[in-house]
C-alpha cells in the first residue's frame, strides 16, 4: 500500500467542500400534506430556534443538534421535520401522509395539525410566510373540485411543471387559517424529482416574501429622499447667489443633509441588496420548475412577472435614487468646500500682504531708529573725545579740542554704524 501524502489542510476546506451538499432536497412520495413556515429572525432568535428544535427532539428522545448545525431532517413519528437556518430567517417544514380519497370535497387537513400546538406557538421570530402544500399522486384533478373548498376561484393560477410531468394549482391568498395554499399533482414523478420540485415551489414562496421586505423600506425611503432632494435643490439655488458671509451656514446645512442621506443609505442599502438577490432567486426557481400554460390559466411565472415587477422596480428605483442623491450631495459639498477654501486662501493672501506691508514699515522705522541711534551714540562719544582732548592739551596734544572733535565725528559715526550693522546681521542670522 503506497504512503499517503497529507499536506497542511485549509481550516475551511471541509466546510467549503460540504457547502455543495447543504440543504439537499429529499426524496418524497405522494400523497403528502406539507406545512411550510418561515420565521423572520434576528441573530438571537435564530440561535433560539436551534434551542427550540432541540427541545422538540429532546421530547422525542432523539439526538440533539450541535452548535454548528444549520439544517436537519428528522422523522418524529407523527410528522417529519425539516429545519433550516438562513441568514435572515428560519424555515420549518412539516410533512405527513395525506388522505386522497375525499380531497377537494371538504376543507383539507393541514400537516400543521400533527405538530404540538404549544411548541408551535413558541416558534422564535415573526412569521413571514406560511404555506400548506398538498402533493397528490394523480395526473389530473379538475379545478372545479379545488375551488370549492381548497382554493379561491377569482385568483386561481395553474400550470404544468417538471416539463409536463406534474400540475400545480395555487391562488397566492392567505386563507382563514393564516396559510396560503398550493396543490401539486405529482403524477408518476420519481421520488427524487418530486423532492426537488417541492423544494423549489416552497422556495418560490419563501423568496417572494423575503424579496418584498424591501418594498416598505423603499416606500419609507421615498418620502425621506423627496424631502432631501427638495432641500438639496434649495441649497443649490442658495449657493449660487450666496456671498462670503452666507457660505459657512450653507456648508453646515449641506453637511447635515449629507449626514441624513448617508444615514438613510446605511439603514436601507443592505435591505435593497438582499431584496435584489431574493428577486433573482425567485426568477431562477420559477425557471427551474419548467412550467407551461395549462388550459388557458395564468402561470406562476406570468403572475410573478406582472405582480412583482412594480415592487421590484420600486426597490431598484429607491436604491438608484439613494446612490444618485448621495453622489449629488457629495459633489455639491466638495464644490462649496472648494469655494470656501479658495476664499479662505484669498483672505490668507490678503492678510499676508498686510503683514508684509507692516513688516516693511517696521523695517523703515527700524532704519530710522538706527540712524538716530548712530547720531546719539556718536554725539556722546565725540563729547568724551572732546573732554579727552581738553585734558590732552595740557599734556601737549597739538590740536585744539574743537579740531579733535571735528576729526573724530566722521570716524566715530562710521565705527558706530558698522558696529550696529554687524550686530543686526548677527541677530538676523540666528533667526
Predicted regions located by residue number:
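Membrane-associated alpha-helical segments
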Residues: 257-382
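Extended alpha-helical interaction modules
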Residues: 95-253, 259
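N-terminal pre-transmembrane cytosolic regions of membrane proteins
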Residues: 1-129, 134
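Signal for well-folded cores of large energy- and translation-related assemblies
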Residues: 233-236, 240, 283, 373, ...
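Alpha-helical transmembrane anchor segments
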Residues: 360-431
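Short, positively charged
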Residues: 174-190, 220-225, 229, 264-289, ...
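Structural beta-strand/beta-sheet cores of well-ordered domains, especially the beta-sheet scaffolds
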Residues: 33-35, 88-90, 178-180, 313, ...
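Cytosol-facing regions at membranes
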Residues: 129, 189, 234, 281, ...
Amino acid at each position: 500500500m503506497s504512503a499517503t501524502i497529507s499536506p497542511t489542510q485549509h481550516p475551511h476546506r471541509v466546510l467549503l467542500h460540504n457547502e455543495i451538499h447543504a440543504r439537499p432536497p429529499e426524496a418524497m412520495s405522494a400523497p403528502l400534506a406539507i406545512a411550510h413556515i418561515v420565521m423572520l429572525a434576528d441573530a438571537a432568535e435564530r440561535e433560539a430556534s436551534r434551542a427550540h428544535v432541540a427541545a422538540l427532539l429532546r421530547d422525542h428522545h432523539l439526538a440533539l443538534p450541535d452548535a454548528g448545525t444549520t439544517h436537519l431532517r428528522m422523522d418524529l413519528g407523527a410528522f417529519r421535520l425539516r429545519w433550516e437556518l438562513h441568514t435572515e430567517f428560519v424555515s420549518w417544514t412539516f410533512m405527513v401522509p395525506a388522505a386522497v380519497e375525499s380531497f377537494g370535497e371538504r376543507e383539507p387537513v393541514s400537516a400543521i395539525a400533527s405538530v404540538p400546538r404549544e411548541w408551535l406557538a413558541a416558534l422564535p421570530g415573526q412569521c413571514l410566510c406560511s404555506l400548506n402544500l398538498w402533493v397528490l399522486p394523480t395526473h389530473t384533478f379538475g379545478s372545479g373540485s379545488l375551488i370549492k373548498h381548497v382554493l379561491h376561484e377569482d385568483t386561481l393560477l395553474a400550470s404544468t411543471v417538471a416539463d409536463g410531468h406534474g400540475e400545480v394549482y395555487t391562488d397566492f391568498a392567505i386563507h382563514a387559517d393564516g396559510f396560503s395554499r398550493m396543490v401539486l399533482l405529482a403524477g408518476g414523478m420519481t421520488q427524487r424529482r418530486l423532492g426537488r420540485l417541492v423544494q423549489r415551489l416552497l422556495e418560490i414562496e419563501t423568496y417572494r416574501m423575503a424579496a418584498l421586505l424591501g418594498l416598505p423600506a423603499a416606500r419609507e425611503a421615498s418620502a425621506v429622499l423627496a424631502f432631501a432632494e427638495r432641500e438639496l435643490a434649495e441649497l443649490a439655488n442658495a449657493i449660487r447667489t450666496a456671498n462670503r458671509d452666507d457660505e459657512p451656514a450653507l456648508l453646515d446645512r449641506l453637511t447635515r443633509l449629507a449626514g441624513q442621506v448617508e444615514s438613510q443609505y446605511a439603514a436601507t442599502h443592505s435591505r435593497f441588496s438582499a431584496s435584489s438577490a431574493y428577486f433573482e432567486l425567485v426568477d431562477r426557481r420559477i425557471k427551474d420548475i419548467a412550467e407551461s400554460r395549462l388550459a388557458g390559466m395564468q402561470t406562476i411565472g406570468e403572475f410573478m412577472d406582472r405582480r412583482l415587477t412594480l415592487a421590484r422596480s420600486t426597490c431598484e428605483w429607491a436604491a438608484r435614487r439613494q446612490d444618485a442623491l448621495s453622489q449629488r450631495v457629495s459633489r455639491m459639498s466638495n464644490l462649496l468646500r472648494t469655494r470656501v477654501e479658495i476664499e479662505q486662501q484669498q483672505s490668507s493672501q490678503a492678510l499676508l500682504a498686510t503683514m508684509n506691508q507692516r513688516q516693511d514699515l517696521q523695517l523703515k522705522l527700524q532704519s530710522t531708529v538706527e540712524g538716530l541711534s548712530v547720531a546719539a551714540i556718536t554725539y556722546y562719544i565725540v563729547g568724551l573725545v572732546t573732554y579727552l582732548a581738553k585734558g590732552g592739551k595740557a599734556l601737549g596734544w597739538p590740536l585744539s579740542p574743537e579740531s579733535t572733535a571735528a576729526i573724530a565725528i566722521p570716524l566715530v559715526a562710521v565705527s558706530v554704524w558698522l558696529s550696529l550693522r554687524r550686530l543686526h546681521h548677527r541677530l538676523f542670522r540666528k533667526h
